UniProtKB/Swiss-Prot annotation:
This is Histone-lysine N-methyltransferase, H3 lysine-79 specific. In contrast to other lysine histone methyltransferases, it does not contain a SET domain, suggesting the existence of another mechanism for methylation of lysine residues of histones. It is found in: Nucleus. It comes from Chaetomium globosum (strain ATCC 6205 / CBS 148.51 / DSM 1962 / NBRC 6347 / NRRL 1970). Residues 120-129 have a biased composition (Acidic residues). GO terms for molecular function: histone binding; histone H3K79 trimethyltransferase activity. CDD domains: AdoMet_MTases (cd02440). Its main location: nucleus. It is an enzyme of class 2 (transferase). PROSITE patterns: DOT1. Histone methyltransferase that specifically trimethylates histone H3 to form H3K79me3. This methylation is required for telomere silencing and for the pachytene checkpoint during the meiotic cell cycle by allowing the recruitment of RAD9 to double strand breaks. Nucleosomes are preferred as substrate compared to free histone. It catalyses: L-lysyl(79)-[histone H3] + 3 S-adenosyl-L-methionine = N(6),N(6),N(6)-trimethyl-L-lysyl(79)-[histone H3] + 3 S-adenosyl-L-homocysteine + 3 H(+). Residues 206-510 form the DOT1 domain. Keywords: Chromatin regulator, Methyltransferase, Nucleus, Repeat, S-adenosyl-L-methionine, Transcription, Transcription regulation, Transferase.
Length: 510
């Protein structure tokens, strides 16, 4: 029996806890989520050096598992209903239950966002021609959070001068190739599928093969997305025009070649992209533009994280299905949009400390470091998840360098967070703590409350289940005396084990 359930020997004045109930309308599946008003800083357009920055909007299917934490529901079978199931992870990440999406794993998830003055947000906008989204004069602004204190340039950014050591990424060809029984695309011969792709932050390029295979990276699609993100995020409108011009731009040529199965045309457009980006790197344009940025567009954050996941976790995702039902070691993921929403609500910024208790494969820990630039900690005890988390961290470090972005410091700890000295020390400095306690036992939740006694005043604790229970005697409920709770709702497609909306809490240490 938990010590908190025993009858008290002392008479203590009863304290009435106050619970804030945030009433939010039930989201409609077809409407986009509009970023809440409690965003940490101003939510603006793409962080660019140019006064009229470019941005990218890509239509995407329902979100796939893209952020992690140890938890959710019970029952070994996967249901197509919206009832919770323990894990919806096959070889590649799929959409939550209830979604009909079966798109390529390279496709990232939609993020909650704030609308700019030029974007009314009606459903009709989704039908706008894709050219409008690439035209610098009509380009829409993508939500991100600007942090005036953040410096985004990676300390090892290659700016066209001298040599550099290889970043050590997992190349796309290592997970999707002819050797993996994939087939050539765009009428290319087997000896013609090899290509290289340049990134804005490095001299070295990534190796791809233009092939297709079930549950494999779509090399051509991945390349096209990189080209769009580089042009729309790292360049001024004038610099981006050769890439995004809707008639003769490189992106248009790539898309046309892919649609017409013109492999040679695709390779020619890719070669021109590589050459033009190299010229911009050499003349210092990339470094100059990154220096003017104060935030990373959420779509780019999601894409980078998906690149990391698809090259490290996805090929071994079956390892995550080995969990012990009915214990604290059940695996499930909070998705990118949910995590961004949490960061907004808790006002997480680059000078803060974030801790994820039960961090799974490290998705949330990495997202906090990349999206907000903060010091980010995660602790996990499941061996398979820990091994994949280490692989993700290594690839994440290399990928951020390729993209020229400096993330916050990442710390991943193995073991029980109740006993990890480094994790407990980090908790004492933490500003935001995430606990995906959807399937935690009552004993573990009670132990967590005891740990929360050491949190600093004002620390935000985000959990899927409250630590304050109405059925407990108030005078014996430690949680009610130290936590002020706000009950909230998360939207559809925010977690991996169900496509339905649900509830969560943000508790403030008082």
């Amino acid at each position: 029996m938990s010590i908190f359930n025993q009858k008290s020997k002392f008479k203590v004045k009863t304290e009435v806890r106050k619970v804030k109930q945030a009433v939010e309308p039930t989201p409609e599946s077809k409407k986009r989520y509009v970023g809440n008003g409690s965003a940490s800083a101003s939510t603006n357009g793409t962080p660019r050096a140019s006064p009229t920055p470019s941005s990218l909007q890509v239509k995407r299917p329902r979100p796939r598992p893209g952020a992690g934490a140890a938890s959710p529901a019970t029952g070994p079978s996967l249901s197509s209903s919206t009832s919770a199931s323990p894990l919806d992870l096959t070889r590649k990440r799929r959409a939550p239950a209830g979604s009909s999406s079966s798109r390529s794993p390279a496709t990232a998830s939609p993020a909650p966002r704030a609308l700019s003055d030029s974007e009314p947000g009606s459903d009709d906008d989704d039908d706008d021609d894709w050219r409008d989204r690439l035209d610098p004069s009509k380009r829409r602004k993508r939500a991100h959070t600007e942090d005036p204190d953040r410096r985004l340039r990676h300390p090892r950014l290659w700016a066209g001068q001298g040599d550099e050591d290889k970043p050590g990424i997992v190349h796309a060809v290592q997970v999707a190739s002819l050797a993996d029984k994939c087939q050539p695309v765009m009428k290319l011969a087997r000896d013609e599928v090899g290509v290289r792709l340049r990134y804005p932050g490095a001299k070295y390029t990534e190796r791809y093969e233009l092939v297709w295979g079930k549950d494999k990276i779509d090399g051509a699609l991945d390349i096209m997305k990189v080209v769009k993100f580089v042009a729309s995020t790292y360049l001024t409108d004038a610099e981006a025009k050769p890439f995004l011009d809707h008639n003769l731009g490189i992106n248009r040529r790539l898309e046309k070649s892919k649609n017409t199965n013109d492999g040679e045309g695709f390779k020619a457009a890719l070669a021109e992209y590589n050459n033009q980006l190299l010229a911009l790197q050499t003349e210092g344009a990339i470094a100059r533009n990154i220096d003017a940025m104060r935030g990373v567009p959420r779509e780019l954050v999601e894409f980078i994280l998906d690149q990391v996941y698809d090259r490290t976790v996805a090929p071994k995702v079956d390892l995550l299905a080995k969990y012990e039902n009915g214990t604290d070691n059940v695996y499930g993921e909070l998705l990118h949009p949910f995590i961004s929403d949490i960061f907004d609500r808790t006002k997480l910024s680059s000078d803060m400390v974030f801790v994820d208790l039960g961090s799974g494969v490290g998705n949330v820990t990495l997202q906090a470091a990349l999206e907000r630039g903060c010091e980010s900690w995660g602790c996990e005890m499941m061996e398979n998840a820990c091994n994949l988390a280490e692989a993700q961290k290594k690839e994440f470090t290399a990928r951020c360098r390729m993209w020229g972005i400096a993330p916050g410091k990442v710390h991943l700890e193995r073991g029980d967070f109740r006993k990890s000295e480094r994790t407990l020390a980090a908790l004492k400095r933490a500003d935001v703590v995430l606990v995906n306690n959807q399937a935690f036992t009552s004993e573990l939740n009670d132990h967590l409350v005891n740990i929360f006694l050491d949190l600093k005043i004002g620390c935000k604790i985000v959990s899927l289940k409250t630590f304050v229970h109405d059925n407990k005697i108030a005078e014996n409920d430690v949680a009610s005396s130290i936590l002020e709770v706000e009950d909230l709702r998360y939207h559809e497609g925010y977690v991996s084990w169900t496509g339905a909306a649900g509830s969560f809490c943000i508790s403030t240490r008082k």
